[in-house]
Amino acid sequence: NDVKLLVTIGGDDTASTATRISQFMASKNIKVQNIHVPKTIDNDLPLPEGQPTFGYQSAKEEGVRLAQTVYEDARTSGNWFIVSAMGREAGHLAFGIGASCHYPMIVIPEMFNKTEITIEKIIRLIISSMVKRKILGIDYGAVIISEGVFHFLSDREILNTGINFTFDDHGHPELGNVSKAHIFNILVQKRLIDLKITVKSRPVELGYELRCVRPIGFDLMYCNLLGLGVKKLFDQGYTACMVTSDPIGDCAPLFLKDVADKNGKVQPRLVNINSQKAAMVYQGNAQFIEEEDYEAASSYLEHPA
């Protein structure tokens, strides 16, 4: 039918489908090139270091605008806000928004790289930040949590929250039907009552409103380069690859076979929690109880350690 090129546009699921299509066409000796364009606000496709997926920067920009407004509300009202951001397995969006807004606590899946993720650990991180700010004489704050943490929680762990979920055909809780921010806010409020700590918190969900915002200049230029890059790679005969564009605008192929497992599933790019950037954000911006705070924290917590 004279089809020469299949262009797929999307995130890791679409990229995985593109990989399997490429494998199928190669097995059938079908001469159709396939080039994938990395588009997702989750920023979790395994592009070279420092290269975002297109759409991420625009979503982050809108998220920062909303998160800054929320933080100002917290300051003027003396309250806390528990914010949740999209992210699936990776915490790029929550990390990018939280770091840009100087949030005192950013909770992403990658920070649990040496321990199991549990609801209890997340609640303790939030309470720790609240108490630390009280010690510092600051009566407000905000925490942002990546919804990706739910990806690593067992069904039992989720059900033990006491939240009433609907269930899919396989008996799994349907997380898409509930606000993650509301879940954590309810659980934190219950714990604060148990601890007799007076803190008011409110939930804010940063969800679908980030997905279709007007693209910022970075993404307009970046997407243009990726589109032109597809044509360049097509003319050069490349197939079964993703188009990439580095910070100076040079386009190159990233072969899908190099970033997919044996089943053709493209592996997500997670936040590099061991990077200097992550270390500086968590060491410089995050506020939580440390050993030198134990005595002061004992006014609020029986066992601050």
Predicted features and spans:
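Alpha/propeptide regions of enzymes that mature by internal proteolysis
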Residues: N1-L6
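Accessory alpha-helical/coil subdomains and C-terminal extensions
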Residues: T8-I9, S16-I35, P46-V199
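Alpha-helix initiation/capping motif
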Residues: G11, G55, I108-P109, T118, ...
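Acidic, glycine-rich active-site loops and adjacent beta-strand->loop/helix elements
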Residues: D12-T14, K39-N43, G87-R88, F112, ...
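Short, glycine/acidic-rich beta->alpha junctions
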Residues: D13, E89-A90, Y222-L226
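Residue-level signature of catalytic and energy-coupling elements of molecular machines
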Residues: P38, G98, V230
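C-terminal non-catalytic interaction/assembly regions of soluble proteins
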Residues: R156-A305
